[in-house]
Amino acid sequence: MKVLKAWTLVLGVMLSWVMAMPAHAVQEVAGVKFQDSLVLGGQPLQLNGAGLRRMMILKVYALGLYVPRRDASPSAIMNQPGPKSIQIVLLRDVDAGRLTDALVGDVEANSSDAEMLALRGRLDAMASNLRKSGDAVEGSVVRIDYVPNQGTTISNNGKVVVHDVPGEDFYRALLRIWLGEHPADKSLKKQLLGLDN
């Protein structure tokens, strides 16, 4: 009987310990799971929001936005110091040329003439590298990461295709694709801001 009581006590302690452990929350979008946090450049980042990019009735990709501090303001997110990460999981095959043209077009639509003058050389170099990287297939994970004093890196399934583009202004320009005044998808913008999850 004493042994049974001892085991009951041990199991009770273990159960309370397990329940006290922090849960790793996951947000799911179209079957894609985004972790609640990640580490980039040695700094923890939080999932600000995740959502679905649609074109007409087609599901194109799921996207998660990771920042140092959650916020519902696009300008506050873009101006937060520290690393940031955009994670895109493709839900269909995407032609490299069309994807690149869409990204460049969305940057242009959300940037002033003066901003484009400063961005053009870096944007053209990024576009050239993206086109050379080949088509992205369904299930591919594209990461667009920014680390201060290092720059913007774009990878496809862990393979770097755009390496260390300098300037935080460049990453802000990419963020404006989804968070700018003329976002690629208004519904996705709300989801990334945590306003429609």
Regions picked out by a protein language model, each given a short descriptive name:
Residues 1-6:
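Positively charged n-region of N-terminal signal peptides that target proteins for export
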Residues 25-80:
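N-terminal secretory signal peptides
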Residues 71-149:
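Mid-length scaffold segments of soluble, non-membrane domains
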Residues 155-160:
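Short strand-turn-strand beta-turns centered on an Asx-Gly dipeptide
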Residues 186-197:
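Cysteine/selenocysteine-centered motifs that mediate thiol-based redox chemistry or coordinate metal-sulfur cofactors
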